[in-house]
A protein has these predicted regions:
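Membrane-active amphipathic alpha-helices enriched in small hydrophobic residues
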Residues: 3-5, 48, 117-121, 216
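Short glycine-rich beta-strand segments
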Residues: 19-25, 65-75, 116-128, 174-180
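Solvent-exposed, glycine/polar-rich loop segments of beta-barrel outer-membrane systems
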Residues: 30-37, 72-91, 125-146, 179-208
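A general structural signal for short secondary-structure boundary/capping elements
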Residues: 65-69, 109-110, 164-165
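Outer membrane beta-barrel translocator domains of Type V secretion systems
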Residues: 1-105, 228-241, 245
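Outer membrane beta-barrel transmembrane domains
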Residues: 42-43, 140-250
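Extended alpha-helical regions
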Residues: 86-156
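Outer-membrane beta-barrel strand-turn architecture
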Residues: 5-12, 50-56, 105-109, 113, ...
Length: 250
């Protein structure tokens, strides 16, 4: 869920604003024990949108935000024929910058085709993870990561106005590739509450190397307030996403 405060100028497509939101993610891992994790993350940030022509067909948008997250993990693992578990809690925090440039081609009165390209940068860190309950508890060292994620895609958008009300619907597909430290973060773990040696953890919870994502967005506004809803799918990890947002324009 998100709140967006936007100040528009007399020039079409030129605006500046800030936003705040809360995101909840529920992860289900494809391991033998079907481990799970719940993530709750809060964000606050600013954005600026700049048009390069009079009708805003070519537009550049940049945004930056800071975030903090609270995570609960239920790790389940199989030993012979029995499933054991261990639970932990940890925190995340960081900051990110997003750049996107888009070009809109009008197909008819209501439909438009919008190809776009972007570059997303993010630095984050997670706290030490020490499982408090369960069998074979693990301890993971605190670590940081740096994400460099270029993206290219296109949207098919529809807009219909009736009075002061606007209805917007878009379907999009995009390709993104992770080039940063996320896919090779060198995380270290050991058996908790012992003097055992540290070892390297293999793999990542979220893999965005060569991901194709699709999105459906539906929005309504009356030029003062608005609401949006979206649902999406990622081929990497077979993730399903969804969210609701609120918007206020001054």
């Amino acid at each position: 869920m998100a709140y967006v405060h936007e100040d528009e100028t007399v020039r079409l497509g030129e605006s500046v604003g800030w936003y705040a939101g809360i995101v909840e993610n529920k992860l289900k891992f494809k391991d033998l024990g079907n481990s799970k994790e719940d993530q709750l993350q809060g964000k606050v940030g600013m954005f600026k949108s700049v048009p390069f022509d009079e009708n805003n067909s070519l537009n550049w948008t940049i945004s930056g935000d800071v975030f903090v997250g609270y995570n609960k993990m239920n790790r389940r693992f199989l030993v012979v024929d029995d499933i054991f578990g261990a639970k932990s809690r940890y925190y995340t925090y960081g900051l990110g910058v997003k750049n996107e440039i888009s070009k809109s081609f009008r197909l008819s009165e209501g439909f438009s085709f919008v190809p776009h390209a972007g570059l997303n940068l993010e630095y984050g860190r997670f706290s030490k993870i020490r499982e408090k309950s369960g069998e074979m508890r693990l301890e993971v060292k605190a670590n940081d990561y740096f994400s460099i994620r270029p993206e290219v895609g296109a949207d098919l958008a529809y807009k219909h106005s009736f009075g002061n009300n606007n209805l917007k619907v878009s379907v999009g597909v995009a390709y993104e590739n992770e080039l940063g430290k996320v896919a090779n973060a060198n995380n270290k773990a050991r058996v908790a509450y012992t003097t055992a040696d540290w070892y390297d953890l293999r793999g990542e919870k979220e893999d965005r190397r060569g991901n194709i994502k699709t999105d459906l967005n539906i929005g309504w506004d009356n030029q003062r307030v608005g609401v949006t809803a979206n649902v999406g799918y990622d081929t990497k990890g077979e993730n399903v996403r969804g969210g609701v947002g609120f918007r206020v324009i001054f």
